[in-house]
Regions:
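Cytosolic covalent-transfer regions centered on His/Cys nucleophiles
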Residues: 1-140
Length: 140
């Protein structure tokens, strides 16, 4: 919560420092997530909130996870599939999906949360990490 990150690269570096010691990611994850974000941007301007959903190939995921970052100020990500201007993401949700193709289902569920004004307000209004997790679970 409230990470001081100005760029996607800083978000990814902070994520690596949290995930690697806990055994969630494999060696090479940081380079892989940066490379994938450059090639396939993940910023989404949703009706209820701006989000980014970066992820990498399952080979870099040691244990499945979903990491949620609420930066202290929005972090600008390029728009997914070239769909418009860069997106100042209020929430960054890093998907650590271990099975090929598993990202699609998770992406759809997360997008549904942030298309719903009440669900998005619930998630954005949380002030603790556990609160964020609980809010996402309520609407997932």
């Amino acid at each position: 919560m409230d990470w001081e990150c100005a760029t996607p690269g800083e978000v990814f570096a902070q994520l690596e420092s949290e995930l690697a010691p806990r055994g969630y990611i494999a060696d090479g994850w940081l380079d892989a997530v940066r490379t994938r974000e450059d090639a396939y941007p993940t910023g989404l301007a949703m009706p209820a909130a701006n989000i980014a959903i970066p992820h990498t190939d399952p080979g870099f995921v040691a244990k499945p996870y979903i990491a949620v970052v609420k930066p202290s100020a929005p972090v600008t990500f390029n728009a997914m599939a070239g769909m418009g201007a860069p997106v100042p993401a209020q929430i960054v949700i890093n998907l650590g999906i271990a099975e090929p193709g598993g990202q699609v289902e998770a992406l759809q569920a997360l997008m549904n949360i942030f298309m719903d004004a009440d669900a998005a307000a619930d998630v954005l209004g949380q002030t603790t990490c556990q609160g964020m997790v609980d809010a996402i679970r309520r609407h997932f």
